[in-house]
């Protein structure tokens, strides 16, 4: 962990942004798995806000008023993720507020249920 306190003494009123790419305890995946192992969010003590990567699901955590944001991925990466709710985050550095921008996509991973070849011939296949 960088010495944020020392940097604040030296540089004063700057914004201190945490950047992190790995699982954090408490983050969830698209299938509902919650990380119990990983890094504790207390490592961001002293940051003004935190931008994360790794988990492809938009979610926000909070550490003593510090927003910790997982923006999601830009598009669905595999069958374990939903087709929608992918995008990016725009930060207002002064207010420490963010906005999640959802991106629509014409592509995705889908699962179809087909009981017989007739389902395809008669266009009766079902999106699961």
Please place each PLM-identified region on the residue numbering.
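Extended recognition/assembly regions associated with phosphoester-bond processing machinery
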Residues: 1-128
């Amino acid at each position: 962990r960088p010495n944020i306190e020392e940097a604040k003494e030296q540089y004063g009123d700057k914004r201190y942004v945490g950047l992190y790419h790995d699982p954090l305890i408490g983050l969830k995946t698209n299938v509902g798995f919650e990380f119990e192992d990983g890094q504790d969010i207390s490592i961001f003590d002293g940051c003004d806000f935190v931008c994360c990567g790794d988990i492809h699901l938009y979610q926000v955590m909070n550490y003593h008023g510090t927003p910790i944001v997982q923006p999601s991925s830009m598009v669905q990466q595999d069958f374990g993720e939903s087709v929608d709710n992918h995008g990016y985050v725009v930060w207002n550095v002064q207010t420490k507020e963010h906005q999640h921008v959802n991106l629509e996509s014409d592509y995705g991973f889908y699962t179809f249920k087909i009981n017989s070849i007739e389902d395809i011939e008669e266009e009766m296949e079902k999106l699961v």
